[in-house]
Amino acid sequence: MSNLSVNAIRFLGIDAINKANSGHPGVVMGAAPMAYNLFTKELRINPAQPNWINRDRFILSAGHGSMLLYALLHLSGFEDVSMDEVKNFRQWGSKTPGHPEFGHTAGVDATTGPLGQGIATATGFAQAERFLAAKYNREGYNIFDHYTYVICGDGDLMEGVSSEAASYAGLQKLDKLVVLYDSNDINLDGETKDSFTESVRDRYNAYGWHTALVEDGTDLEAIQAAIEEAKASGKPSLIEVKTVIGYGSPNKQGTNAVHGAPLGSDETAATRQALGWNYEPFEIPAEVYADFKENVADRGASAYEAWTKLVADYKEAHPELAAEVEAIIDGRDPVELTPDDFPALENGFSQATRNSSQDALNVVATKLPTFLGGSADLAHSNMTYIKTDGLQDDANRLNRNIQFGVREFAMGTVLNGMALHGGLRVYGGTFFVFSDYLKAAVRLSALQGLPVTYVFTHDSIAVGEDGPTHEPVEHLAGLRAIPNLNVFRPADARETQAAWYQAVKSEKTPTVLVLTRQNLTVEEGTDFDKVAKGAYVVYENATDFDTILIATGSEVNLAVAAAKELASQGGKVRVVSMPSTDVFDAQDTAYKEEILPNAVRRRVAVEMGATQNWYKYVGLDGAVLGIDTFGASAPASKVLAEYGFTVENLVKIINNLK
């Protein structure tokens, strides 16, 4: 029976890829046995309840092998992946896109495809499960109790982010993380002997992982024994499974020819004969469906039913905790954050927005028990520390400060995994200039609709002495270009509070907070509530103004000072604080006209970053005071003056406009 089901997985993949004339059959054919074993013997999922929070998670880190996952989901009974959807693989509007997409297809636990990120994301799943189990489980009531499984390939393990995350997972002793390594000695360009020769198991042993070798990737009993051994090891586990890419293809197996191209009709026919598969394309024997129903769907439904009874009993035994758990199950925060939770701030109060952020995130941490995060070895510079808690590790699972180490990319992907798991609000910090290290993770936050908060400090050339390697220039423009990402650069402590509030209330959009090292003064006109609009009027000395200054972050203080100088010269000026261009762009036309009336063409935008994004606001008649070169090393006041960020220069630019 098992051989028939394994071949059903293979040929669903082969046939769908042939029909699409696009895809990667090699991994489907080679990894089918381990995937079959995982789904029918280990993975505890319920196709009728695909979002069950205590299900085991499965991450196909080798996302190019998506038909392996779709075949498994179809056979297991997930409604989203009907046979029609299998036949529509890689077609417009289908539930079976080229790489798995979270939120698009039920049963897909994470968006994968960029290699390495799946392993790192799985690390976040495992850490989320551990925290929630420590917080809410009680004797006899293991409400959160599941494993996270991964299938990865050689390419995943070559990527640096998997190494960062594996080092971190070993440090954290995340023992419910099990990675199955599809080790087939082939990559797209040829054989791995030309590009990847270290002992992966030795490397992972050094990270603090349990490792094992299955020498025959078709030996289901050996695979099963290795998984059971891994689960009992008390460590994260890597099981190297030696496979043959394109297994069963007489002329292509074991070569890179089967990695990323359809088999074609002739080789498919030969493979059918070689594997004894006497069925038409997309024809699946009833016995295979029965196998998956009994060993995946029915087994999972029984586990789900037992768990729901456990939760009901838990509500009786622990009603206060159960109320929080019920909110988590429903996808809500266990406690609601409100604007009134943040203290009022006096005008004129001066503080760096990184410090304002520290104050605000501690307000959030006090209110929300499931709010946690950390920094890439910069907590005391990013000001990301929750003051009531210590560091989280295996011995202190309830602490909410996470020390990611100098692993920015892994930090972003781990945060994604924690957010994907559900039940948590998470954040991570580093210097803004180092956001490039984790930009690929930020992009996947946005693509997956995950409300992760990124805290990026030291936001401009005002860093000063550290010089151009540490002074962001192009970073704001780059992050603003990512769809479904809200970038906030607050002007003062009040706007920083509001930006944090917007971040925590977000459901489907990640947030970037871009914060200063230098002190900024709370302006009289900044407004907590209006930050929700992305831009608003912060200063105006006449209702018939003829000049608009648009500024973000630290430049709002500069713009207001320049406006007051212009006012003393008889100028009529409006200053607009635009903490988030993304949020402002989403407002309706009427609000945009209210803030930036088309009739007023005399406009200047002020921001210590690349200028290109600002011309859509100032137009051809306006001007931009920005930076399109790298920064410099000197005291901040000298750097700012040399780059023209002074009241005198800004007034001059405005007066030179027609």
Locate predicted features.
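A short glycine/serine-rich beta->alpha loop
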Residues: 16-25, 53-61, 104-116, 345-349, ...
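Thiamine diphosphate
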Residues: 91-103, 127, 131-134, 140-145, ...
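Non-catalytic terminal/interface segments that mediate subunit docking, oligomerization
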Residues: 309-451, 528-536, 543-544, 550-553, ...
